[in-house]
Amino acid sequence: MRTEIEIPDEVTATMDHLEVTVEGPNGSVTRRLWYPDITVDVEDGAVVIETDDDNAKTRSTVGTFESHVTNMFHGVTEGWEYSMEVFYSHFPMQVSVEGGDIVIENFLGEKAPRKTPVRGDTSVEVDGEELTVSGPSIEDVGQTAADIEQLTRVSDKDTRVFQDGVYITETPDRGDV
């Protein structure tokens, strides 16, 4: 089984041992792709994934690797973006980016600020009560958005009443990726 993924024009892909590095206008993404009896290589303007095995697990792993590579191409060309929104009813919370951390102050009237790190090459922009999380790596962008959402999770309270928090309102469109 052999699968070829064509490298877009403005993108370069290199293979270093087991790691694929993809560079483009939005940055670079590196990912380790390894599975027994599957080889990944860059040949003639394409990323080639091939194997001699024909069992279900190997075929599904080849498909997974293909998805990872196409997500990397999409990330370095168009990028990935999550939209988030701040909701509060009584205590106005302030969200800011300080260094490599997202800081949420005055959540439910708390005195101590809540912090979470920004992962990888992800950028977070705060515009009033709207946040935009974007970057070239879908894993880093998604995990940063999830970390922000979990940072304001309210435990031991009825979430129908205590709806304060920062929530993901729009996820990336994975249409033809």
From Swiss-Prot:
GO terms for molecular function: rRNA binding; structural constituent of ribosome. This is Large ribosomal subunit protein uL6. It comes from the Archaea. SUPFAM superfamilies: Ribosomal protein L6. InterPro entries: Ribosomal_uL6-like, Ribosomal_uL6-like_a/b-dom_sf, Ribosomal_uL6_a/b-dom, Ribosomal_uL6_arc. This protein binds to the 23S rRNA, and is important in its secondary structure. It is located near the subunit interface in the base of the L7/L12 stalk, and near the tRNA binding site of the peptidyltransferase center. One of its GO terms (cellular component) is cytosolic large ribosomal subunit. Keywords: Ribonucleoprotein, Ribosomal protein, RNA-binding, rRNA-binding. Part of the 50S ribosomal subunit. Pfam families: Ribosomal_L6. Gene3D superfamilies: Ribosomal protein L6, alpha-beta domain. PANTHER family: 60S RIBOSOMAL PROTEIN L9, 60S/50S RIBOSOMAL PROTEIN L6/L9. It comes from Natronomonas pharaonis (strain ATCC 35678 / DSM 2160 / CIP 103997 / JCM 8858 / NBRC 14720 / NCIMB 2260 / Gabara) (Halobacterium pharaonis). Belongs to the universal ribosomal protein uL6 family. GO terms for biological process: cytoplasmic translation.
